[in-house]
Amino acid sequence: MSSAICPCGSGDLLLACCGRYHAGQPAPGAEKLMRSRYSAYVLGLTDYLVQTTLPVQQGGLDREAIAQWSAQSTWLGLEVESSEVFGGKPEHAFVTFTARWHDGNGEHSHRERSSFVQNQGRWYFIDSTVPLKAGRNDACPCGSEQKFKKCCSAYVE
């Protein structure tokens, strides 16, 4: 495994690339986190996928479905189109990418613009399939101690 190339498409060795984030080192930015999440799908690292999702959304994830999809797919590649980081406290970002895979139903391509937020030195994926239960004037679910309308609401599509 020490000589394995990272599945994220960087061309670097896994241990020097996404493997260090899988081992617990915080990803330094949203794009690195997104690439490490793609690699986690390739490698079947369901726990990592859950742990790097916004903590208030983790309970709404279907771990079994994630693991099954990961295992039943042959991952064909990742292309990052853009990465936009927005300043502020906390920092937010969008990463636009296309992931390709093959499964029992053929070859697939999925293009997505994902949202991310940084909290306490860690970046988290904001999963659009798990609703954030917050009113505009409620505390933001990301833990920033700001109102939702002043924090993550603009980054949830």
Curated annotation (Swiss-Prot):
In terms of Pfam families, this protein maps to: SEC-C, YchJ_M-like
Q: What is this protein called?
A: UPF0225 protein Psyr_3863
Q: Which NCBIfam families match?
A: PRK00183.1, PRK01617.1, PRK01752.1
Q: Which InterPro entries match?
A: NTF2-like_dom_sf, SEC_C_motif, UPF0225, YchJ-like_M
- Give the family from UniProt: Belongs to the UPF0225 family.
Write down the species.
Pseudomonas syringae pv. syringae (strain B728a)
